[in-house]
Structures are given as structure tokens and as C-alpha cells.
Amino acid sequence: LSGEHIWCQGFSEPNAGSDLASLQTTAVRDGDEYVINGQKIWTTVAHLAHYMLLLCRTDPNAPKHKGLSYIIVPMKDEKGNPYPGVTVQPLLNMAGTHEFNQVFFENVRVPVKNLVGEENQGWYMAVRTLDIERSNIGSAVGQQQNVEDLIRFVQEARGSGQERVSLLPSLRYELAERWVETEISLLLSYRVVTMQNRGLIPNYEASATKLYSMELNQRIANTGMKVLGLYGQLARGQKWAPLRGRIEFMYLRSVANTIEGGTSEIQRNVIAGRGLGLPRD
């Protein structure tokens, strides 16, 4: 892998998030091409991407899960300019970084050969993509590093960190809990990686990893802010920001973790239904 091309996923729309199959972006067959119109939102790195895996509606008369197709859409032309008919607008997150975008398609033409799989069978391709995404979204190694850095801060800092832990013994317990939880997160990730190495596609196992890991991100950030005290509010790049402002950024950025790639509620539904065989509500 050369890493020369960046891809993004065109899934969510303003009125189709958790209910993804309600999406309205269309691809109409015109000879050897599809003509695409519609809008996607919360598209990660669309402003950098060379291609998009687009989930769109090719049969408006079919049941909503049955009339969808998976199409590769160029995001840039050969000169690196926006592909004709594609407009990308930034959406800054609360941490102040540009990761998300909204993407508009106006009579975008792509060849029929860009269809992935069979026409009107795109839902199954999208679900498979999400299973793979969720299996890789866990950040166990980074979580361990953050917790270990917080522990080291308490051990080495002269001032706020040690004082807060001595004044609030409950923080000692929180740090211990976070450390144990990062070990659990790592083991969940190992299970998913082992399945992938065996040629299996994780399903509810990926959802379990995503759910636990992303909610753990928020717990680590909350504990970190307690440990760092007022200095924890200092952002990256500021002189006195402890741990280079990582915890402040994590505190803000982790809010999106339990939304992107499927909300925590969606993950629990997947685990309950596909993993435990429980009936739907």
C-alpha cells in the first residue's frame, strides 16, 4: 500500500443518520453513466479525499433497504481540482478541527463500472463496510498511552496534579479503573484483529469494541480533566497546557466518538440482536 489516495464514506444525510436507509441521494442510470444528485453530511476527510464510497438510491420504488447501491465517486479530477458537480463545505467540530464536511452532488456523472457489487444491493455492502470501520475505530493503544501519561503526571508533577489526587482519593480509584478498562479495550481489539487475520468479518464483535472503546474515551477525558484541574482547560499549543493539551482536545473531540460510525444506541441494538439473539423492541 502506497498511501497515495484518500477515501471517504458518503453515508449520512441531513435526514438520514441512524435511520440510514432513509437516505435520498439518487443515482439515475443514463446510458453508461450514473447521474448523481443529493447531499451527504458529517463526511470525514471529504476535503482531502480522492474518492468517495457513496451509498445512494437507485430504485426509488423499492423498499428503502432494497433500492440502494454502492458507487465509487471521484472527489477530484486529474489536476487535483474538485470533480465536476461535487462541492465540499467544511463543518468544524467543537474541538476546532476540520474533519467533517457536507458534500453536495449536482448532476455528477460517473461511469457505471464504478458500481461496487450489484445494483440495488448496496445496503449489504454498506453494512459490511461499517463492520470493518467499527472494528478499527477502537483506539486501545492511544487510550493506554493517555492513562499512563495521566498516572505519570500525578507521579512526577509538583503542584496541582498530586495535590488534587491527595485531596480527592476517589481520583486514585478512577485512575485505577481507567487503567483496567484500557486493558479490557485492548483485549476486545485483539479479538477483532484475530478474526480479521482469519479472514472473518467481525459483526457484533466490532460493535462491542466500538461501543466500549468510544465510551471509554469519554471516561478517560472526564477523569483527565479532574486530575489536571483548571490547567486541563488549556488547549493544544498553549504554554502551560499539561500533556500538550491532549486531554482538553480529547474532552471535546470524544463527544463525537459515540455518534460517528453509528451511535452507542445502534451498537447496543446490534449486540442485542445479532450477538445475543434478543427480539427487537
Model region roles, listed by residue range:
Residues 27-28:
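A structural signal for short hydrophobic beta-strand segments in well-ordered beta-sheet cores
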Residues 120-132, 136-140, 228-281:
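Glycine-rich phosphate/cofactor-binding loops in nucleotide/flavin-utilizing enzymes
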Residues 3-12, 55:
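A short, Trp-centered hydrophobic/proline-enriched beta-strand micro-motif
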